[in-house]
Amino acid sequence: TFDRYRYTPVFSASGGADYQWDAEDQFVTDMQALTGMSVLSASERVDASTSLGARYLLKGGGAIALNLTNNFTRFLTGDVSELGTGALIGSFTQPLLRDFGSYIETENLMQAERDLLYRLRDFTRFRKTFAVRVASSYYSVLLNRETTRNNYAGLLANNLSLEREQAFQAEGLRTLLQVGRLEQSSLQQDLRWTSSITRYKRSLDDFKILLGLKAEENIALDDNEMILISETGMDSPDLNLEQAMDLAVQTRLDLYNGLDRVQDRARKIEVAANAMKPGLDLSLVARVPDANDGDLGELDFENALYSAGLDFELPLDTKLDRNSYRRALIDYEVATRNYLLDMDNIKLDVVDLWRRMNQARKNYEINLTSVQINERRVEEAELRAELGLGDIQDTVDSQNDLTAAQTDLISSIVDHNISKLEFWRDLGLLYVDDSGQWEEGVNESR
């Protein structure tokens, strides 16, 4: 706002007053001849001055100024009571070589406006990144909760098998070695369950802190969210990798910031080159005095004075300016390389997220098959165990493998969903509204 304010009329006003008292021994010849004494004389007066002005800075480098001045003197002693002088002065100055041109004069204003645009783009990017961060943290809490539930279900299944095998042991159908293996498996599953509870509570507390809540506050997580992402979370974006990289280059606001900064550095080169030119300034001045009768506020336009001049300055020591010019050239090259590096990093991020989604989708397919296989293994092991024909090791392995496969299945769903959110974010196609809801891509919404 200040840079814009500089190009509006700026008004000024000033004033001041002084009181003066002078005393001096003035020898008066006649009085000395009569009395032989000197006479003490004193003078008192009040001086006041006022000034009103306006200044308008032109975007071409020139400046227009208008000032109205008044000087007023009032004598408190003597015959003359008061005197006053004033003038209306108008001036125009315009650089003709150095500092000439709107691109030079308005550089600070343009840079300030572009810096504001950069901050708006950065804030938009931050909103997208923060939304993905909150969603990722939320899904991680859901994953830890589902892991805890799976470990608890596995513990119940192990305890049920242990009770059955202990009953067989009491009948002499199982040995202590066989039952001990199942007891050890139950203890390990209990340990995994308690550890998963700790991780779940810690992740939930971290999520509260991220939302600005206190860790001791209670919040309820939506149980339907995991079902929802399980049903829709494995959908793939409707575009290929080449299209994704092209979209990222075209839509990423932070990449536009990098490109615009290259243009900023190019302008700085022109400004630095202009600073090495000689100084040649044109000045036009008009002065209208007040009327000779001494009345304030009356101007004598017939006796106005006009003047014009050129002020030339030939720079002989340009070491500092030449260093600034070289620095501007270097900054331009740095900005260009940073822009190209940002473009490569954006493409690399898109490729990495594309691979993560594919890997998560492949993991999902493998883990889904693994869950189905281990469910059949557990079912068969339970049937054989109930008939007294089962093997303890088969029972332990099938149940542990089922619990691990169920946890890995949920983990692959969460990982794919988070990767997809980050993918849309890095493509610049994740839109966040004022309520915090986001829209992915074109037709996918949340």
Question: Where are the model-predicted features located?
Answer:
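Bacterial Sec-pathway N-terminal export signals of envelope proteins
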Residues: 1-47, 92-114, 120-127, 173, ...
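Short beta-strands and strand-coil junctions in structured, solvent-facing domains, enriched
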Residues: 98-99, 216-217, 254-256, 270-271, ...
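Small/polar, glycine/serine/threonine/aspartate-rich low-complexity segments that form flexible
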Residues: 14-90, 94, 225-238, 269-274, ...
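Hydrophobic, small-residue-rich alpha-helical packing segments that form membrane-like cores
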Residues: 84-97, 101-191, 196-205, 209-212
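Acidic, glycine-rich loop-and-beta core segments that form the ion-binding/anion-interacting portion
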Residues: 171-238, 242-270
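Amphipathic alpha-helical coiled-coil segments
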Residues: 1-3, 126-152, 160-162, 167, ...
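Acidic, low-complexity, intrinsically disordered peripheral segments
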Residues: 4, 19-21, 205-235, 241, ...
